[in-house]
Swiss-Prot record:
Glycans are attached at N5. It is found in: Cell membrane. This is Olfactory receptor-like protein OLF4. Keywords: Cell membrane, G-protein coupled receptor, Glycoprotein, Membrane, Olfaction, Receptor, Sensory transduction, Transducer, Transmembrane, Transmembrane helix. It comes from the Eukaryota. Residues 1-25, 80-100, 159-196, 261-272 are extracellular. It is a multi-pass membrane protein. It holds the Pfam family 7tm_4. The chain crosses the membrane at residues 26-49, 58-79, 101-120, 140-158, 197-219, 237-260, 273-292. Belongs to the G-protein coupled receptor 1 family. GO terms for biological process: signal transduction.
């Protein structure tokens, strides 16, 4: 029993992006700026939706929740990385690493489910406009949100418990800027067959399945839009989906890039850089993508800050 306990290490080293001292101030300033923009942008979007009663609709309900999750998602990794860069201390305890991994998987999963639910919401709004508010009632919206949280929490808990059974013998260095699940599994010196099988199963169930749902929803949406005779109505229908489609494409393309880069040999640096895209860049861009051409969001913020439409 004592031998087994000795294989449990007290801490890991997060190697980050670069050990070059001259690059540390640049990296700190870059990620601090992106972090602050992410928090501010998503908070403003939540503020706009909550302050304007006209935006209390299913679409904006899910959008506000997506912004909240994006804030939490970013807060699981960036603050620790900023502290490590500033203090030049890359140590993270075993317990902190497990906690960070759990919440990262939790919020990444909720992000994924919410994007799928939002695609379903747009499908209902465009394909069944007369019954939209009846179908997408507050009870169903709350239920879809609750199911997203529960499924993601269960998945995150299961993956975390699977990591807790692993032993780490000699390799204490994580070639990443946070405790990423796949990196943790690769560092283990015990048998990881079950962990890898669970990882692939989760990728199919929680990655491919929601993506198929999104693609199916947009296939039906495009088919429905093509049947609209009015050019103005076509443009309006398409514009309501363009923002969400941009966010979905950004999220899934960058996630796929991380998955492919982590599967390739000798690609830890590439995987870290690719991870920045969906852990930092995507949450930062989401509020701007949704509000750039959205007159309702800009109008709500204008009323809130200036007191007039």
């Amino acid at each position: 029993m004592e031998l087994e306990n000795d294989t449990r290490i007290p801490e890991f080293l997060l190697l980050g992006f670069s050990e070059e001292p001259k690059l540390q101030p640049f990296l700190f300033g870059l990620f601090l700026s992106m972090y602050l923009v992410t928090i501010l942008g998503n908070l403003l979007l939540i503020l706009a939706v909550s302050s304007d009663s006209h935006l209390h609709t299913p679409m904006y309900f899910f959008l506000a929740n997506l912004s909240f999750v994006d804030i939490c998602f970013t807060c699981t990794t960036i603050p620790k990385m900023l502290v490590n860069i500033q203090t030049q201390r890359k140590v993270i305890t075993y317990e902190s690493c497990i906690i960070q991994m759990y919440f990262f998987e939790l919020f990444a999963g909720i992000d994924n489910f919410l994007l799928t639910v939002m695609a379903y919401d747009r499908y209902m709004a465009i394909c069944y406009p007369l019954h939209y508010m009846v179908i997408m009632n507050p009870q169903l919206c709350s239920l879809l949100l609750l199911v997203s949280w529960i499924m993601s929490a269960l998945h995150s808990l299961l993956q975390t418990l699977m990591v807790l059974r692993l032993s780490f013998c000699t390799h204490f260095q994580i070639p990443h800027f946070f405790c990423e699940l796949n990196q943790m599994i690769q560092l283990a010196c015990s048998d990881t067959f079950l962990n890898n099988m669970m990882l692939y199963f989760a990728a199919i169930l929680l990655g491919v399945a929601p993506l198929v749902g999104v693609l199916y929803s947009y296939f039906k949406i495009v088919s429905s839009i093509r049947g609209i005779s009015s050019a103005h109505s076509k443009y309006k229908a398409f514009s309501t989906c363009a923002s969400h489609l941009s966010v979905v494409s950004l999220f899934y393309c960058t996630s796929l890039g991380v998955y492919l880069s982590s599967a390739a040999p000798q690609s830890t640096h590439t995987s870290s850089v690719a991870s920045v895209m969906y852990t930092v860049v995507t949450p930062m861009l989401n509020p701007f993508i949704y509000s750039l051409r959205n007159k309702d969001i800009k109008g709500a913020l204008n009323v809130f800050f200036r007191g007039k439409p």
